[in-house]
Regions:
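Interdomain coupling/hinge region of P-loop NTPase helicase/AAA+ cores
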Residues: 1-3
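Membrane-water interface of transmembrane alpha-helices in multipass transporters/channels
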Residues: 5-7
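Soluble catalytic regions of large protease machineries
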Residues: 10-15, 21-177
Length: 177
C-alpha cells in the first residue's frame, strides 16, 4: 500500500528535494539532474537522481566537493525555509552519506587539506582503530572541516538563490516529478 503524505510533508519534501536540485543545477561540475520527484518510494519521501554525462571510473577532489554540496542541499533548504528547529529527520541518510564520503576522502583518497598526507589508504574502521588517538582525532577534525565547508558553500548558494528554491519547490509540489 502506498503512503499518502500530508500537505506539510509534501511541502517539506518539495523544499528538501528542491534544495538538492538547486545545488546540482547551480554548482559547476555537479552531475546533471536526470529526475527529481516527491513521490514516496520505499522509505524515501522523494529523490533527486543525478547521472554523469560519461562513464565515471574515478572522481576528482572537485567532483567529490560537488557531491558533498548536493548532499547538503536538502538539509540546508529545510533550515533556510523552516528554521533550524524545524529541520526534519529526512536528511539523515544524506548526512550519513556525506559523512561516509568525507571520511573516505581523508582516509582512503588522501584528499586532505592537511600538509601531512600521512593518513591515506585506510580501508576499514579496523584500520582506524589501530591508529593512535592523535591521528584519529586529526581524521575526525578534517572530516568535520570538510563537512562544514560543504554546509557553508551550500548555505551561501541557497541564500543567494532562495527565489529559485521557492520556484523549484513549488514546481515539485505541483507536478510531483
Amino acid at each position: 500500500k502506498s503512503y499518502v503524505m500530508r500537505p506539510q510533508e509534501i511541502w517539506n519534501t518539495a523544499c528538501h528535494e528542491g534544495g538538492h536540485a538547486l545545488v546540482a543545477l547551480l554548482t559547476p561540475g555537479a552531475d546533471p539532474i536526470h529526475k527529481a520527484t516527491i513521490i514516496p518510494r520505499g522509505r524515501s519521501l522523494g529523490h533527486v537522481l543525478q547521472l554523469p554525462e560519461n562513464d565515471v571510473v574515478s572522481l576528482t577532489r572537485k567532483q567529490i566537493r560537488c557531491k558533498l554540496d548536493v548532499m547538503f542541499g536538502g538539509r540546508v533548504a529545510e533550515e533556510l525555509m523552516f528554521g533550524k528547529d524545524n529541520v526534519t529527520t529526512g536528511a539523515t541518510n544524506d548526512m550519513q552519506q556525506a559523512t561516509n564520503l568525507a571520511r573516505r576522502c581523508v582516509m582512503q583518497f588522501g584528499f586532505s587539506d592537511s600538509e601531512d598526507q600521512g593518513v591515506m589508504g585506510l580501508m576499514y574502521e579496523d584500520d582506524v582503530r589501530r591508529l593512535g588517538p592523535e591521528t584519529r582525532e586529526r581524521i575526525d577534525k578534517e572530516v568535520k572541516e570538510m563537512l562544514q565547508g560543504a554546509y557553508n558553500r551550500t548555505m551561501r548558494l541557497m541564500r543567494n538563490n532562495k527565489p529559485k528554491l521557492l520556484t523549484l519547490a513549488n514546481a515539485l509540489k505541483e507536478y510531483e516529478t
